[in-house]
């Protein structure tokens, strides 16, 4: 019995470990170097899904700390990614509290809203408080590929949730 409980704890921390790994490893930057225009903000997809389905797996403090780590690794001013992730948490929490039954279509639409506000805050703060330059075409590609890969990761995370974590939605 204790062995099963221990395995469940490991499976429950899987998304959190993946979030920290993604923030430390610069996977997004490496994908952009391999594929010319393919860039993906996988952290936002991960945070949004698990805040909607199982918020106790990813606490707000962990997400904020992961944002700080991401800022240090990527060379952004400290706190910009964290604030962007907190916007994702805010929209996800609002949707979770106001909806009775979530579907992939409703999650996808609300993810678009969350991503727009999150990126708007991120790039306006980055533009006003740093000397880093960015092109709007890269932002557009990032939003496009993140939005259209969301259903794929939604299905993969649902399979992970049903098979390993448990099917209990909030």
Each language-model region and where it sits:
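Terminal, non-globular segments
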Residues: 1-170
């Amino acid at each position: 019995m204790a062995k099963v409980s221990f395995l469940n704890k490991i499976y429950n921390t899987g998304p959190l470990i993946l979030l920290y790994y993604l923030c430390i490893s610069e996977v997004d930057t490496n994908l952009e170097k391999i594929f010319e225009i393919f860039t993906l903000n996988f952290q936002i997809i991960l945070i949004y899904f698990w805040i909607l389905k199982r918020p106790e797996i990813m606490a707000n403090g962990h997400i904020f700390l992961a944002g700080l780590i991401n800022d240090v690794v990527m060379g952004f001013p400290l706190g910009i990614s964290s604030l962007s992730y907190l916007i994702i948490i805010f929209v996800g929490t609002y949707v979770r509290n106001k909806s009775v039954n979530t579907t992939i279509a409703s999650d996808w639409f609300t993810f678009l809203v969350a991503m727009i506000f999150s990126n708007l805050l991120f790039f306006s703060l980055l533009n006003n408080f740093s000397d880093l330059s960015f092109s709007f075409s890269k932002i557009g590609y990032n939003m496009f590929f993140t939005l259209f890969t969301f259903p794929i990761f939604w299905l993969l995370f649902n399979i992970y949730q049903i098979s390993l974590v448990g099917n209990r939605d909030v």
